[in-house]
Amino acid sequence: MRECYSGDIFVAAFYRQNEESFLEGIVKGLEYFGGTPQKIIFDNARVAVKEGFGHHAKTTDKYLALSAHYSFRPVFCNPAQGHEKGLVEDLVGLVRRNAFVPMPNISTIEELNAKLLEYCSMYRSHKISGKNMTIGEMAENCKEHWIPLPPYRFDPSNTIQVKTDDFSLVRFDHNKYSVPYQYSSKMITVKGSGNKVEILFCGKTIAEYDRDYRYDRTHYCLEHYIGLIEKRPRSVYNAAPIKETVPTEL
């Protein structure tokens, strides 16, 4: 994301270009900027547009809810018209050249996003050619024209209600994730964000995972089954959670 007047930037990385990642990126960007502009210009992306393009674009229900929550007017570009969003097109190369040269040693997407956020903060001290103030100073000046953030954060996640199976597993987006055995065969809530899967029962988080976009994978957390294994000690030899999480050398 890039603010047109000041040139202030926000960049975040996600595993996939899906609706929840797109919406989460906007929410985090507005929080980073500290407010909402009167309008936001977008690519004619499928994750935000059901049909049409440009002035005739019809937004998805979730995106319409996002724009209503933050009170901004969405404006969509026409297909294959990169010049309509030139500031953002240039931003990709800017971040690649400055934040990733030389190539940093990063092992998780959390580390990657921390690196990107650090660069965004540093960029505020930069002064654009022909401007008298830094990007950060100009960003502060234009905030008086912005809409204050609402008191409650918009939830961009893909949320479903589902029943766990007899093995304390819940299916979400082609994969299975374990929950503590006490919640076996209970209705729970699964919230899939761009990079995380959060599982809740009665509003309380009972498990959290990195989101897996592969197919037919099962993710066990051994701690979820400890109490059950203590009651059935012989299951330690054949229990799937142990086979999948404990090294064979042990």
Which residues fall in each region the model found?
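RNase H-like two-metal-ion nuclease catalytic core shared by retroviral integrases
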Residues: 42, 54, 74-96, 112
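RNase H-like polynucleotidyl transferase catalytic core
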Residues: 64, 68-85, 104-106
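Active-site beta-loop-alpha junctions of metal-dependent nucleic acid enzymes
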Residues: 11-34, 213-220
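Protein C-terminal end segments and domain termini
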Residues: 197-250
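Acidic/histidine-rich, metal-coordinating catalytic segments
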Residues: 35-55
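Active-site-proximal acidic segments at structured loop/helix or strand boundaries
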Residues: 92-191
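Short conserved beta-strand segments at catalytic cores or DNA/RNA-binding microdomains
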Residues: 1-7, 14, 66
